Amino acid sequence: MSNCVIEAVLIRDAHYALPPGAGTDSVHINSEYCLAVTLLKSCQGFLGTGIALTLGEGNRLVCDAIELLARPLVGMEIEELMADFGTMSRRLADDPSLRWLGPHKGVVHLALASITNACFDLWAKSRGVPLWKLLLDLSPEQVVALLDLSYVEDVVSRSDALAILRAHACNRAARESILHSGYPGYDTSVGWMAYDNDKVRQLLDKAISEGFRAFKLKVGSTDEQRDLRRAAMLRERVGDDGIVMFDANQHWNLEDAIRMGRELGKFKPLWLEEPTHPDDVRAHVVLARELAPVKIATGEHIPNRVLFKNFMQSGAMHFVQADCTRLAGVSEFITVSLLAKRFGLPILPHVGDMGQIHQHLLFFNHIAMGQEVLFLEHIPHLREHFAFPAKVSGGRYHTPTEPGASCDLKI
C-alpha cells in the first residue's frame, strides 16, 4: 500500500432547494437541505469527501469550524492516521481553543462529523474498496483503535468492545447474505408535514408499488385533529400488515406528548419518534412508561455517545436513531452501535446523509456485531446530487460497490 498523504483541506458550503413541502415537519418549515462538506485532497489524487447535514444559513458556521478544526490533518498519512484514529478523534474533539463551544455538541461537533467522514472516505478510496468492506476487513483490535471510548468506559470498555466483536466473528458468514439480499428501507418522504392528504396518498401508492412496506408520517401540527386524520388515513392506506411510524420532531411538551401519544397509539405505530425535547432524558423515561406498548425512537438530535449512554441506561429509548452526520462521524456511530448492542437495542439511523454512508454502516453492524436487521430510512431528495446515489429497489438498499463511503457530490 503506497503512502496517501493529506495535502490540503478544502471546504464546500452546499445548499440544495427541495421541492415545495419536502423536508417539512412540525418545527422545521423550510424546504432546504444543506451539507457542510470536507474535502481531503491527497498526494495520490484521491479526494476524501465528508458531509454533515444542516437546514439553512447555519451551514456556513459549520464550514468555518471545519477550517479551524481540520488543520492538524494536513501532512498526515491516511494509514497512520486511521491506525489510531480514536486518539486523533479525541484530540480534535478536545481542541482547547474550540472545545468551549461544545463540548462534543453543536457546530464544532457537526464539523468533526464532516471531517471524520472524510477521513473514512479517503481511507476506503486509498484501499480501493467500499467503506463496508474496509470495516469488515479490519480485526476487532483495528476497529476498536478507531474509537474514542472516553466517558463510556463504565458501560463499554475497550475489552468489552473487543469481546462483542470477537464473539460475533466466528459466525459472520451466516449473516453475509444481507450483502446479496439488500437492507430493508422505510420511506419518510411520503409524509412531510406540508403535504396534503392527496399528496400523501399519491406518494404512498408510488412507494408501495416500489416495494416499501414501512412508512413515516410527520405529526405535531398546530391542529391536533389533522394529525389524527392523517394517521388514520395512513393506517387505512397501508393496511393492517403495513408498518407505520409517527414523528413529532420534538414539538410537544411532556403533557401533550402523553396525550397525543395515546391517541396516535390507537393506530398501532412501530414507534413514536422525537416526542419532546431531545435533551430531556427524564421526560423520555416517563413517555416510555406511560405510552407502553408504543415504543419511543429518538437520536437524530442526540449529539454524542455520552448522552446516548444516558438514554440507554435510563430505559428512555427503544429504537436508536444515531446519525453519523450528527455524532462525530463514522467512528462515534460505531461506538454508539456497540452501546446499543450492549443494551440489546436496535440501530435505525436517522439519515442526515440521505442513507449514503449509513448503508455501509448497517451492513457492517449486522455482519460484524450481529445487530438486528430492521430498516434504513429512505429520503430520496438529494439523489441527483450524489455521484453514486444509493441503489434502492424493491424497498431495499443494495450493497454499494464503488470505493469510498458513497458521499461524493457532483460539482
Give the ranges of each region predicted by the language model.
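Shared catalytic-loop signature of beta/alpha-barrel
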Residues: 262, 268-271, 277-405
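N-terminal capping/lid subdomain adjacent to the active-site entrance of alpha/beta enzymes
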Residues: 2-244, 249-258, 262-266, 386-411
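Short, small-residue-enriched loops and turns at beta-alpha junctions
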Residues: 193-195, 220-226, 248-255, 273-281, ...
